[in-house]
Amino acid sequence: MNKLFRSPAVDWPFKFAQKLERARDERLKHFYSQPLPAPDTPLSEVMFLAVDFETTGLNPNKDGIITIGLVPFTLNRIYLRQAKHWTLRPKQKLEEESVVIHGITHNDIIDAPDLSEVLGEILESMAGHIPVVHYRRIERDFLDNALKVRLGEGIEFPVLDTLEIESQIQNKLAGGLWNKLKGKKPASVRLGQSRRRYHLPDYTPHHALTDAIATAELLQAQIAHHFDSEMPLKSFWL
């Protein structure tokens, strides 16, 4: 399926250079000043960073980030000793529905820092890496909006989206006239269901660090099963 995946043609190094010129916050300036891998870098040579957020809801304009999990990895190794996890105190009230999903209560966040207090550490961990997420509108949109609220300026960064990759794979596998006549539909691309197709173990969901590790393992499996690890980074980043 090497020709399957098509990503938008975004020149991320050029965009970072532009953002560096316009950024006002010193933490953002430092983030944009760190070089990204070249677009033609083979996937096998890229240092990725799996990222997962747990939030108070699904709307980045009115909900907030509660926990962040990060873990660096390559296609051959996950660096668990370098994994990081933060619990944050959101500006928004915790709703009962979200507490049921992620299990984080008011007592868990009462003494937690605001995102602004640990932003430098988070951006330092992300700098120079290529984030990998499962559904980019959570991690990218929530962080962008959170920074706009706190700094008056947002953030942009490239990602590999394992949900988007899996969606394209499943659409391809369910395509064709014969499958249409049989009524075959693309399989679910939720994180847990996607992992099971690659015989990856079930993890308890909705913990930011666990889900970040699960996402890293999923990308490794997707590339191993469907793509050539020497394909260029620019074929996948969004």
How would you name each of these model-derived features?
Residues 211:
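Short, conserved phosphate/pyrophosphate- and ester-handling motifs at nucleotide-, phospho-/glycolipid
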Residues 1-38, 168, 197, 216-238:
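Acidic two-metal-ion nuclease catalytic site recognized across multiple nuclease folds
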Residues 118, 214-215:
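Short Asp/Glu-rich motifs
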Residues 155-162:
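Short, acidic/small-residue loops that bind anionic groups at enzyme active sites
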Residues 162-182:
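Short alpha-helix plus adjacent loop in nuclease-associated cores
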Residues 53-56, 162, 215:
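Ser/Thr-centric signal marking residues that sit
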Residues 15, 19-51, 55-150, 156, ...:
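Conserved non-catalytic scaffold segment of RNase H-like nuclease domains
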